[in-house]
């Protein structure tokens, strides 16, 4: 138990310091990191200062990449590492502190739009794909040539999807290829209608077609994620895909396939459990998990309104990356809600090492908004932007007089009947309103006070005026190992 809250003392003596060695051979550096394309991006913008953001696992190549780019572009490069939140998000705050005019993001990315206008280029590090093995795996999982199927992949394998589709199209008639949804530059206008954008990908659907009609074939996993259950990108797709459609995955190295239906069922069951925990909760901790993704302020205000409407008390916590040791300092909080990008919001849920559940914003929406989800939509969204006004999935809170608030609700965890939420005015910053009683007493309902009264130890209690006054008497003599009145037995 001690190791969950602190590192052992000998870890400091055994820790190896210094910069990790070069991960990629120098001759392969240009191809792996697409340095020619990146250099062209920098020269076209005419930037003098550029930030290079690397995740922890790629920092070994950062110095060599920065030196090569400075040599080819003449611009000053700044390396960003150890981001305060998830490394998959663009660190616009770190780039601004360095005075950078553009940012290059290397490694896995959630492709969430940044909160502030900044030219950004993404380098996903292309991963080799065994196309012939993937074709055989696809044919084994999809024997019907007329069945509609979408080709999906992890970001590092997206470059091979068109080549895979070219090999499959002579036999399969209804094949759709997804592509990464890179954020559009601020103020840019597209001459053509944008395709459907969901799960960080774009889907060029034909007119009249819906994504819910398609099954899915996912290329990725294994090498990038040894444990598929801990892969937030695949989990996001499994949660959001239509429950009645087939979903299979394929390893790009070996062609090994797996039907993901059972895993999707487990993820949805876990999400339903988390929604029930949120409905039972009285105190909710809102964790600020990002400061660099667009609309994070609006989403935080939306979540606070949700908890207030549902009669729950909420606290906003800015702790950086959530860890079990940090969140264990708040035992009064029943559930935490992590406001982060889609990948960052799912990662703590999949780890399973926290003392209290960590929810995604859409799970809190399902728990606190009786009008959500809208008809025909399963509550399996993964990005908080889908909950805000302007999104096709946004559903406003019902008015206080709506019958939806009075619908009887029984907890599936405790079996108790949940009381309807008590609406509070916006200027009430304390607990529920004080109510006069016939005996001229005041009754106060406070989740914090209820939690304190249930604790076995409530701190030092002065008990002023409640302790009888007695004369001072002689205490025990000696030391703890042998007091004088204990004898020598």
Swiss-Prot record:
Its cofactor is [4Fe-4S] cluster. [4Fe-4S] cluster binds at residues 89, 110, 341. Keywords: Acetylation, Disease variant, Dwarfism, Ectodermal dysplasia, Hypotrichosis, Intellectual disability, Iron, Iron-sulfur, Metal-binding, Phosphoprotein. Pathway: Protein modification; peptidyl-diphthamide biosynthesis. The modification Phosphoserine is found at residues 7, 446, 456, 488. The keyword Transferase does not apply. One of its GO terms (cellular component) is 2-(3-amino-3-carboxypropyl)histidine synthase complex. Component of the 2-(3-amino-3-carboxypropyl)histidine synthase complex composed of DPH1, DPH2, DPH3 and a NADH-dependent reductase. Interacts with DPH1. This is 2-(3-amino-3-carboxypropyl)histidine synthase subunit 2. It comes from Homo sapiens.
């Amino acid at each position: 138990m001690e190791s969950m809250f602190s590192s052992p003392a000998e870890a400091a003596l055994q820790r190896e310091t210094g910069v990790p060695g070069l991960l990629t051979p120098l001759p392969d550096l240009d191809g792996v990191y697409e340095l020619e394309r990146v250099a062209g991006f920098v020269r076209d913008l005419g930037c003098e200062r550029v930030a290079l953001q690397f995740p922890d696992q790629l920092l070994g190549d950062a110095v060599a990449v920065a030196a090569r780019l400075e040599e080819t572009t003449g611009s000053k490069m700044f390396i960003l590492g150890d981001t305060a939140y998830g490394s998959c998000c663009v660190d616009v705050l770190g780039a601004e502190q360095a005075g950078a005019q553009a940012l290059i993001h290397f490694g896995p990315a959630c492709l969430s739009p940044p909160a502030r206008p900044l030219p950004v280029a993404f380098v996903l590090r292309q991963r080799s794909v065994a196309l012939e093995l993937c074709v055989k795996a696809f044919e084994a999982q999809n024997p019907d040539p007329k069945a509609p199927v979408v080709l999906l992949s992890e970001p590092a394998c997206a470059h091979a999807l068109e080549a895979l589709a070219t090999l499959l199209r002579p036999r399969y008639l209804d094949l759709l290829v997804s592509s990464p949804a890179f954020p559009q530059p601020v103020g840019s206008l597209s001459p053509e209608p944008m395709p459907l954008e969901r799960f960080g990908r774009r889907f060029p659907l034909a007119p009249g077609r819906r994504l819910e009609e398609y099954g899915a074939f996912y290329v990725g996993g294994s090498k990038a994620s040894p444990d598929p259950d801990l892969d937030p990108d695949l989990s996001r797709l499994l949660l959001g895909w239509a429950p009645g459609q087939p979903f299979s995955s394929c390893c790009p190295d070996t062609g090994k396939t797996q039907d993901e239906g059972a895993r999707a069922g487990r993820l949805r069951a876990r999400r339903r459990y988390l929604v029930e925990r949120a409905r039972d909760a009285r105190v909710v901790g809102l964790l600020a998990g990002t400061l660099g993704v667009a609309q994070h302020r609006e989403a935080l205000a939306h979540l606070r309104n949700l908890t207030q409407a549902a009669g729950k008390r909420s606290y906003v916590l800015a702790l950086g990356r959530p860890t079990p040791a940090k969140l264990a300092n708040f035992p009064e909080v029943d559930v935490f809600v992590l406001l982060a990008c889609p990948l960052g919001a799912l990662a703590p849920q999949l780890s399973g090492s926290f003392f209290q559940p960590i929810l995604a914003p859409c799970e809190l929406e399902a728990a606190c908004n009786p009008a959500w989800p809208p008809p025909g939509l399963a509550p399996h969204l993964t990005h908080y932007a889908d909950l805000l006004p302007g999104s096709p999935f946004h559903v406003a809170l019902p008015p206080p007089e709506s019958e939806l608030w009075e619908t009887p609700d029984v907890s599936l965890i405790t079996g108790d009947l949940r009381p309807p939420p008590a609406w509070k005015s916006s200027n009430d910053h304390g607990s529920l309103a004080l109510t006069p009683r016939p005996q001229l007493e005041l009754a106060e309902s406070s989740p914090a006070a209820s939690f304190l009264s249930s604790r076995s130890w409530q701190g030092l209690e002065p008990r002023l005026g409640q302790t009888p006054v007695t004369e001072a008497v002689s205490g025990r003599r000696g030391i703890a190992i042998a007091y004088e009145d204990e004898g020598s037995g």
